[in-house]
Design a protein with these regions (language model features):
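N-terminal strand-loop-strand
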Residues: 1-17, 45, 49, 64
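Charged phosphate-binding loop/patch that engages nucleotide di/tri-phosphates or the phosphate backbone
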Residues: 115-140
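Unchanged
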Residues: 23-46, 57-112, 135-140
Length: 140
């Protein structure tokens, strides 16, 4: 995870986030995930699986809607550095995830990322004024 502690104007300042980012033009979501992991952690994803999607209406700084594809990387090559331009990179034990400063809503779907159910989850988590309003999901 990245502890977003490097940029004072960061919307995520002080919080822990999974690695990822925005897609480039003409880039599919799997290629975008591999590129973001390579850019942010200097590792190559050898195996990953789509665990779910989340729609975040109203989440952006100006109330923009965000949509995320959540992947679990199960095999990689390389050694991540201690930090990147966004902050410190940390390996976090699963049982410690809920103790970290996270976005309020992340606590609702993190367990779905690591559970034994092979089906992907698809959730919607509206935000208003920087706060989660609700959380609903289904599995397919």
């Amino acid at each position: 995870m990245v502890h977003r502690n490097a940029r004072q104007n960061d919307q995520h300042l002080g919080k822990y986030n999974g690695l990822g980012g925005k897609l480039e033009v003409d880039e599919d979501v799997a290629a975008g995930m591999r590129r973001e992991i390579r850019e942010e952690a200097s590792i190559e994803c050898l195996e990953m699986s789509l665990r779910g999607t989340v729609s975040w209406p109203g989440f952006g700084k100006q109330g923009e809607d965000w949509f995320g594809f959540l992947f679990l990387v199960t095999r990689y090559r390389g050694t991540p550095p201690a930090q990147n331009p966004e902050g410190d990179l940390k390996w976090v034990a699963l049982d410690a995830l809920q103790t970290l400063p996270l976005w309020e809503g992340d606590r609702h779907f993190l367990s779905l990322m690591f559970d034994a159910d092979p089906r992907a989850f698809h959730g919607v988590m509206p935000y208003r004024d920087g706060r989660m309003v609700s959380w609903n999901y289904s599995r397919v």
